[in-house]
A protein has these predicted regions:
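Non-catalytic, conserved peripheral segments adjacent to functional cores
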Residues: 1-94, 113-142
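Conserved metal-binding segment of the jelly-roll/cupin
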Residues: 90-112
Length: 142
């Protein structure tokens, strides 16, 4: 089921024999709110990261290298899609950004040797703004 507010948006990809160019974000993009921080997150084969939920920040994700599989669960109690789940894959072949609004739990993994995730948040990360858990519903992160 589609979670309200989750968007996977194709972005430009420029093939080049010297190395491809992958667009990430422009301040002109309709989904761009503001710049807070950018993180590059490496993930190794079959490892899982998460569960994470931002209380105020929107995440804009893109894959810089490899392929990443996301598990998303709506944690917004007043949402029509509360507790619903969605699986989304990002990779270079179908280059896209994934917009995750505040209140959505997410985790991610890769089936590649290594993948790199880029995450732009519209505010600054803090312990008060970010919630982490090892288990959401029946899904565990070790």
């Amino acid at each position: 089921m589609k979670i309200i507010g989750i968007k996977k948006i194709p972005v430009k990809f420029f093939e080049n024999s010297k190395g491809d160019l992958l667009k990430f974000v422009s301040k002109k993009d309709h989904f761009f709110k503001s710049f807070g921080e950018v993180y590059f997150n490496e993930i190794n084969y079959k490892k899982k990261k998460g569960w994470i939920k931002h209380l105020k920040n929107q995440c804009i994700f893109s894959v810089a290298f490899g392929e990443i599989n996301f598990k998303l669960i709506d944690g917004r109690i007043k949402s029509k899609t509360f507790d619903k789940e969605e699986n989304i894959t990002l990779n270079k072949n179908k280059h896209s950004v994934l917009i995750v609004p505040p209140g959505i739990w997410f985790s991610f993994t890769t089936n590649k040797k290594k993948s790199i995730l880029v995450n732009l948040i519209n505010g600054t990360n803090s312990l008060e703004e970010t919630v982490k858990s090892k288990k959401i519903k029946n899904y565990y992160i070790k």
